[in-house]
Amino acid sequence: MTSILCDVDLIEALTPTINRVVLTPKAPVSFQSGQYLQLCLSDSDKRPFSIASTPNESQLELHIGGAVADQYASQALAHLLQQHQLQQPVQVEVGLGNAQFRADSDRPIILLAGGTGFSYIYSIARTIAHANVDRPVFVYWGVREENALYHNEVMQQWAHTNSKYRFIPVVQTPTVTWQGRTGMVHQAVLDDFVSLEAYDIYVAGPFAMAGVVREAFIKQGAHQEQMYADAFAYI
């Protein structure tokens, strides 16, 4: 873990309630794809966010939900915005977590995210493509409404870079014009795979979702030691 000051270079809206934040560290930092950072609002208030960028990039990208009802995220976003306006840096701790991508495995991969947990699998998916990993990779991204699929086109393009890559967006409450999968994202995985025994599975999303996913996937053959999510340490 590295503690470092970062300039807040960009805050832009991806949707009405989700923002992309770009931080530039004052010095080089190292982390593994799938790890997270903590934004230090104070010495006693540190808030974790998945790193959406890849380790070979010089900037740190975050995807932060800013809904007023979500004070945990909105307060962090307000701090970032304040520092950006004042042209002052923020303090972050980088390289935390144990759910990083296991590049030395030869198993096929399932990346599963709910909501802004997508930033976690976004980093891993791009790392996989950059390294030309030639294994089947299935990316499932679940959202409540289709307008929350803020990187849908980006991921469709990612899937076209390799015939073994697949991107499956899943919308919980779709409009009548939605053509894709519907319902709960973990159920889409269960419907698509008779057995999950052979897969490395990476999961990001709310703690409640992570618990449901772990239990359901193990029942369908997944090995707990081949399932990765930082939430698993707390549930």
Could you tell me what each predicted segment is?
Residues 2-88, 145, 172-173:
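Ferredoxin-reductase
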Residues 94-105:
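A short, basic/flexible loop-to-alpha-helix module at the beginning of a structural domain
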